[in-house]
A protein has these predicted regions:
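Catalytic cores of nucleic-acid endonucleases
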Residues: 54-110
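Conserved catalytic cores of phosphodiester-cleaving nucleases, focusing on short active-site segments
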Residues: 38-40, 44-55, 68
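Domain-level recognition of nuclease-like catalytic cores that cleave nucleotide substrates
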Residues: 88-154
């Protein structure tokens, strides 16, 4: 992961910790063998945040998480999975790419199959820079807005 992605991940964790202090938030949490960008735990409630920058197959992340949760790799009564999608998944003609649609489909199916699990796709209103490119000037505000959206859901 690049330094910008790490900075965004840290900013989101810090904002979530301020907004929802009852959760113990950490970055790079593992669910079985799958690393999750940000995770928070409050008693028997777990929140998982996966940030999709420009992954070729974001549905794979969703499927792996729900597979591990189905195998009870994470003991919790309620698990909220938030999958954040950057502008990379937006189509110039409007709408979103099939990559994102597939990930959202897997999330919906996982939620229907597993009673204690909830999935939410979240727009992360940022176009990630190419490797070595400049960070968008408003990235901190975007991270803060996204953290508030997640916090309101929790």
């Amino acid at each position: 992961m690049g330094s910008f992605a790490t900075a965004v991940q840290s900013r989101l964790r810090e904002r979530l910790a301020a907004l929802r202090p009852r959760f113990d938030w950490e970055t790079e949490h593992h669910v079985a063998a799958t690393p999750v960008d940000i995770a928070g735990r409050a008693d028997s409630h777990v929140a998982l945040v996966e940030l999709e920058w420009r992954r070729a197959d974001p549905a794979d992340n969703t499927a792996k998480l729900f597979r591990h949760l189905d195998e009870e790799a994470l003991a919790a009564d309620v698990v909220d999975v938030f999958q954040l999608f950057t502008g990379y998944y937006d189509l110039a003609s409007g709408g979103v790419s099939s990559k994102r649609l597939n990930a959202e489909f897997v999330g919906r199916v996982g939620t229907q199959a597993l009673d204690s699990f909830r999935y939410r796709a979240v727009d992360f209103a940022l176009d990630p820079p190419q490797r070595g490119g400049d960070r968008p000037k408003d990235w901190e505000g975007v991270a803060d807005t996204t953290a508030r959206e997640i916090g309101e859901y929790l």
